Amino acid sequence: MHNYLDFEKPISDLEGKILELKKLASEDESVNTSDEIARLEGRVRDAMVEIYSKLSPWQKTQVARHPSRPHFLDYASRLFTEFTPLAGDRNFANDDAIQAGLARFHGTPVAVIGQEKGNDTKSRIKHNFGSPRPEGYRKATRIMEMADRFGLPLITLVDTAGAYPGVNAEERGQAEAIARSTEMCLNVKVPIVTVVIGEGGSGGAIAIATGNRVYMLEHAIYSVISPEGAASILWRDSTRAKEAASNMKITAEDLKSLGVIDGIIPEPVGGAHRDPDAVISRTETVIGDALKELSARNGDELRADRRQKYLNIGRNL
């Protein structure tokens, strides 16, 4: 059973009718519903194409947050072999919101970092809903240092609403941890390929997203603040999030036009959650092509390119 978003009601109604017909056919073999099911499935496809071809920024935000959308661990299990997670920041604790470790991508040793939101209540609590604490960013910094030391390409997958804003996180130096992670991301002399697979929220995202090549999934979002947060600041009213989203330039199309990202990875009609294997396969191709291109550059070129790309974000807006 799909978790339908509010704008997907036409799809929900049609798929509900299909389920009813399938149930009827299973209960009475004399009833032939195949033609009607085929007709309704065609209408579902048409409805999805029509709806998803003109999503508003707020609707894309909803898709990026869809509970069934594939997250970091879904990508890791399909993109990499021999993925070995590493834990702890060697200072305070381990943070499961940041998943990081060593793996092979198409046989090549790589370092991998990403945010994991979880897919049910238990795992979401374990991963703190994808909002990293300071120790998570310090773990990311440690993995970046390791990648630089051993000359391993770095792949980062971004999916967070933002860094955890709790009092304890602030007491343990959240701002400093994000800044150090961003600095390390800019300074390493290995190729970095970043993909925003869901939400890219604020400094919590950019701390692992200053790559040589940055891509977004078609319905991902990337912003300095959530639409709800922006609405709360601008109008003291979080219910105006839809209005805020429309003015924030948070979609992949907007950010590509502004030069913030390098490319957009198409999603299956209906969003990544409708066909995770397809979108992960497309992501694999994009990462592979980017690493192949970047492998021809030396470390100094990679670092200079990445730093200039980061500085250009504010200049080009």
Swiss-Prot record:
Which parts of the sequence belong to the CoA carboxyltransferase C-terminal domain?
Answer: 40-293
Report the GO molecular function annotations.
Answer: acetyl-CoA carboxylase activity; ATP binding; carboxyl- or carbamoyltransferase activity
Q: Does the keyword Lipid biosynthesis apply?
A: yes
Q: Name one GO cellular component term.
A: acetyl-CoA carboxylase complex
**Pathway stated in the Swiss-Prot or TrEMBL entry:** Lipid metabolism; malonyl-CoA biosynthesis; malonyl-CoA from acetyl-CoA: step 1/1
Enzyme Commission numbers on file: 2.1.3.15
InterPro entries in the cross-refs: Acetyl_CoA_COase_a_su (IPR001095), ClpP/crotonase-like_dom_sf (IPR029045), COA_CT_C (IPR011763)
| Gene3D superfamilies per the UniProt record, alphabetical | 2-enoyl-CoA Hydratase, Chain A, domain 1
Principal place of residence = cytoplasm
**Which reactions fall under this protein's catalytic activity?**
N(6)-carboxybiotinyl-L-lysyl-[protein] + acetyl-CoA = N(6)-biotinyl-L-lysyl-[protein] + malonyl-CoA
Please give the biological process terms from Gene Ontology that the record holds. fatty acid biosynthetic process; malonyl-CoA biosynthetic process
Domain of life, per UniProt, equals Bacteria
Keyword terms: ATP-binding, Cytoplasm, Fatty acid biosynthesis, Fatty acid metabolism, Lipid biosynthesis, Lipid metabolism, Nucleotide-binding, Transferase
The protein's location, in the record's own words, is: Cytoplasm
Q: What class of enzyme is it?
A: transferase
Complex formation: Acetyl-CoA carboxylase is a heterohexamer composed of biotin carboxyl carrier protein (AccB), biotin carboxylase (AccC) and two subunits each of ACCase subunit alpha (AccA) and ACCase subunit beta (AccD).
The record's similarity note reads: Belongs to the AccA family.
This molecule's function is given as:
Component of the acetyl coenzyme A carboxylase (ACC) complex. First, biotin carboxylase catalyzes the carboxylation of biotin on its carrier protein (BCCP) and then the CO(2) group is transferred by the carboxyltransferase to acetyl-CoA to form malonyl-CoA.
Q: What is this protein called?
A: Acetyl-coenzyme A carboxylase carboxyl transferase subunit alpha
Record organism: Rhizobium meliloti (strain 1021)
